[in-house]
Amino acid sequence: METVRIATRKSPLALWQSEHVADRLRQAHPGLHVELVPMSTRGDEVLDRSLAAIGGKGLFLKELELAMLRGEADCAVHSLKDVPMELDPPFALPAMLTRHDPADGFVSNLYASLDALPIGARVGTSSLRRQAQLRALRPDLELLDLRGNVNTRLAKLDNGGYDAIVLAVAGLERLGLGERIVARLQPPQWLPAPAQGAVAVECDGGNARLMALFAPLDDAATRACVEAERAMNRALHGSCHVPVAAIAQWQGDDLHLQGLVGSASDGRAVRAEAVGPANDPEGLGQRVAKLLLDDGAGELLNV
């Protein structure tokens, strides 16, 4: 019996996503044996500093990629928003699964919305993108760092450390915690991270057998959207060190891409949007990036 080993982080959300991919693989290939290889990454272990301070979201990938290179796993499953814009050889993304809700969720035990927060309320997030948009919308708030997995963050809220926190809707709903969302933060006022809500499979792009195994899991509509968002981010040289947000949505047969570059320190933000053919998401992403740069985003990117 053929076996596929999936490298995954150990967090509940990462395990859920990897098991979801495993289930889809078993459905697509009856008789295939799929097993998870849970691993801890530096991004999971260092929780007292922001991701930007310790090397960025790529920390979530490196150990999993090393496991593949050592032959301990055949593939890895990631939240696509954590995947760098450029993969190191020989890696590729053979499958981007159907995207979940890409929105951010406002979570609070006391207040029904972002607007309802009192002046000086404490909001937890370590995401520079979320901080930038919070400062733009509510410059009076006190923004506090918040790291850890979803359950850890919720526990910190419940223990009184924050008046509200912001988490991805997809992560909460995948873990059966959707009832904790009191409001969705959505376009056009609020934009998610590029590729937020999408799960991707990574493997050796030169391994034709693996590439073919994962091909049935790929969702073309999702891939078009997230490739436009990631192309914009790539053209801006964005990373978790810079507040960049993007969302592409289908508009008939075309894609509508909205992008934002912000400042986590003072709430300044530059926005741009464009519509383009779905068969050229790269071009659309580059066009919106140019619009952002033409409108002054470069100044924020170089802060």
Swiss-Prot record:
InterPro entries xref list: HemC (IPR000860), Porphobilin_deaminase_cofac_BS (IPR022419), Porphobilin_deaminase_N (IPR022417), Porphobilinogen_deaminase_C (IPR022418), Porphobilinogen_deaminase_C_sf (IPR036803)
S-(dipyrrolylmethanemethyl)cysteine modified-residue sites: C240
Gene Ontology terms: biological process: protoporphyrinogen IX biosynthetic process
Gene Ontology molecular function: hydroxymethylbilane synthase activity
Keyword Cytoplasm: no
Cellular component per GO, a single term: cytoplasm
Catalytic activity: 4 porphobilinogen + H2O = hydroxymethylbilane + 4 NH4(+)
Cofactor-binding details, from the entry: Binds 1 dipyrromethane group covalently.
Pfam families in alphabetical order: Porphobil_deam (PF01379), Porphobil_deamC (PF03900)
Pathways involved: Porphyrin-containing compound metabolism; protoporphyrin-IX biosynthesis; coproporphyrinogen-III from 5-aminolevulinate: step 2/4
Matching CDD domains: PBP2_EcHMBS_like
Signal peptide from the UniProt entry: none
Keywords for this protein: Porphyrin biosynthesis, Transferase
Keyword 4Fe-4S assigned: no
Cofactor: dipyrromethane
EC numbers on record: 2.5.1.61
Subunit annotation: Monomer.
Note: The porphobilinogen subunits are added to the dipyrromethane group.
Record-linked HAMAP family: Porphobil_deam
Role this protein plays: Tetrapolymerization of the monopyrrole PBG into the hydroxymethylbilane pre-uroporphyrinogen in several discrete steps.
Entry's family note: Belongs to the HMBS family.
Protein name: Porphobilinogen deaminase
Organism: Stenotrophomonas maltophilia (strain K279a)
